[in-house]
Structure formats: C-alpha cells, structure tokens
Amino acid sequence: MAVRRRPSRPSRFTPDFDPDFGDRALTDARHDIVIGRWQGVRDLLRATGDDWVRRTHRLRLLSHAAAGSSTAEAWWAAEPHNPDAAVLRAATEVVRVFDTAIAAGRGSPVNRAQLDATVEACLFAADAAPADPMPWVSLLSVARLYEGGVPRRELRGWFDELRRRDPYNTEGHTQLLRYWSARWHGTHGAMYDFARDAAGVAPPGSPLPVLVQVARVEEYRYIADGALGRGPVRGFDQHWKHELAVTELRRTHERWIGGREPGRPVSPEEIADLNCLAHAACYAGQIEVARELLGMLGARASWVPWAYTGEPEEQFVRFREGLGVV
C-alpha cells in the first residue's frame, strides 16, 4: 500500500537583522577589527572614496566595532598621516564617550576632560580630511553629552560645516535632531521644526524627509519612558495614526520613495531609514504604503525602531503576513 505523505509546511519567514544590512565588505572589515587587523579597514575606506552616504554609514558601524579594541589607535600609530585613520579614531572616541555616559547612568555628568578630548580628536580629523563630512557628524553626535549643551553659535558652525560637505547627510541631521529633542537639549516642538525644515529642502529621492518619522519615534520613546509604571497615556494610541502623522508619512513616501530611480536596488545604507518609514506606515494603518516598503526591504530588518514598540521579529513578521507580503 502506498504511503501518503503529508504536505510539507512552508518554512516560516525569518527577518535578517544583519547589522551591516548585507554590506559584505563592511562585515569583513569589522571582523578584521575584532582580531586586531586594521589593513582591511584601510582598504575598505580607500575603496569607498567620496561616496559620502556609504562612507558615513560604514564609518559609523566601524567605529562601534573599534570602540572595544585598540585597532583604531594601532592604525593611526602606524599611518599617522592617513586621514581615514584620523577620522575613524575620532568616530571611535565618540562611541567610547557615549559608552561611558551609558555606564554612568542618565543624569550623571560625563567627564568634561574626556568630552573635550573627543572634540579635539574630531577637529583634528576635520583638518586631516577637509572634504569629509564624518568628523562633523561626530561633533554633532558628541555635542549632546555636554551638560547644558554647547553654545548655539558653535553648534550652528559645526552643522554648517557638515552641510558644506554633504548638505543632505541623513546621519548628521539625525544627530542634531536628537540634540534638539526633549530627551536632550530641546523640546518636541524644536525637534519637529528642525525635522520639517530639513525635509522641506531635500531633493526628490533623498531619504532626508524620513527625519519627521525619526522625530515621531523619538517622541514616542520619551513619552513611553516617562509613563513607565504610571499606566497608559491618554490619546497615546493615536500617536502613529492621527491626521498629521499620516499626512507626513505620505509626504515622506512621495518625496523619498517616489523620487528614487525606478527599479534601483535598495542599498545597505538605506535599510535603517527604510525600516523607520515602514514601521511608521504599518502603525499608521497605511496598507498600500506599508506593503510596498516591506516588499522593498525583503528580509532586511533593523532593530530600531521596531524594538521601541515590542519584540522586533514578531512585529516584522506579523505585519508582513497581515499585509500579504511575499
């Protein structure tokens, strides 16, 4: 008698939370850092050239990998006149000073001498690599750790230097947006004003308009953290789906996604911002937009912002399945 086989179940979709978003060359360089080799990092940054978007993305992730080792310092010691070594060293110092701040706990001041030394490393890198926007991104990042912030004129000067080199640098704008957030040295209103002003001048196809959705995530985090142990916040369930949130979501989609070259593959440096926009679309109930964005992402997921609203993998899978994304 023939044995009837059970139909095999389709394998369950699993998101890929690759921190490098599929950038294999970056993954190899980060592995080199772990084992103390800097030559692969040097070669990667040389090959990246003046593709500022990709370079900023790669340097940010390389600096996180380098913060727990002496690889960045070893490279700079071996090649003190290599501007890329100076830029990575400065970015790595920024990560380290943030690690110190996190370890000390919120509200604990960071050692002023360490902050000043980090700023000096960034300014040195800016002199060594005058065309590179990354040292200015690093400065805008470390600025928010100063108790009371930095003088407005100085902050504005750093931002102007960034924009002279890369006027639509999303990472640099994101760092300044966080500076102006209520969590740091501003208010929700100041943060949204900055995001909307930046989005308004971005050219079609630029991801910069997603700053408005980044601001919405920052506001959500701030309110949710403040409500811990105090019960639900009135009206908070409409945070993602009220009229203005939906209007701005659709505007970002139109200006960024609608302005991209049709059929152009999604690059690794776009994945984090695309996750932010997809998250906003899912929670706003914008079915067609969410379906398109999740389709563009495929399996490429980022922990942020999904981790702020629940378990990242569960949400990513649930929305994909609910929207019929294949």
Language-model-detected regions and their locations in the chain:
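Alpha-helix N-cap/N′ positions at the starts of helices
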Residues: 21-24, 117, 154, 272-273
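Short helix-capping/linker turns of helical repeat alpha-solenoids
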Residues: 81-83, 131, 168-169, 269
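Short coil/linker segments at helix-helix boundaries
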Residues: 47-78, 91-131, 135-164, 171-204, ...
